[in-house]
A protein has these predicted regions:
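Short, Lys/Arg-rich flexible segments
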Residues: 1-79, 83-85, 95-148
Length: 148
């Protein structure tokens, strides 16, 4: 019988061990929560930039929660606890002809359009997320393959 030579598979065994070690649940959990936290920080920055400013109170009160795992799902929240935030986001009705002393004029329009800062920020996040996730995943996998 002919001999085809010998193969040393120690590098493949090492790679398999590194994958098992890096793919531990704790490391994967840390990767996913870190990824979501970074995405939420970017969203927070975008939403704050899109928020209109009079005295800055609305802009200063945007907050995010830390990413959490619930079963197989990771989630985080963005919120603004100012009572008039939904009216700035979505718009609101107003009484035409009413005098407003703060601006010294009567109201002319029956509806004030919303600024949609959260909605626009979420659209930007959805647009940019695939490339961001791909880049971070590639870095994570390359670290895993190098054994770092």
């Amino acid at each position: 019988m002919a001999s085809w030579g010998s193969c040393d598979f120690h590098e493949l065994r090492d790679l398999n061990e590194r994958i098992k070690a890096a793919a531990s649940e704790q490391e994967m959990d840390a990767f996913y929560t870190g990824l979501l936290d970074e995405m939420m920080n970017g969203l927070l920055t975008d939403v704050k930039e899109l928020t209109p400013v009079d005295r800055g109170h609305l802009r200063r009160n945007w907050f995010i929660t830390k990413a959490k795992r619930s079963g197989k799902v990771y989630h985080a929240d963005i919120y603004n606890n100012i009572e008039y935030a939904p009216y700035v986001e979505n718009g609101h009705r107003q009484e035409v002809g009413r005098y407003v002393p703060a601006i010294g004029k009567r109201l002319v329009n029956g509806f004030v359009e919303g600024r949609h800062m959260l909605r626009e920020g979420l659209f930007d996040l959805q647009r940019d997320a695939p490339d961001f996730i791909k880049t971070k995943s590639e870095k994570f996998l390359s670290r895993m393959m190098e054994g770092k």
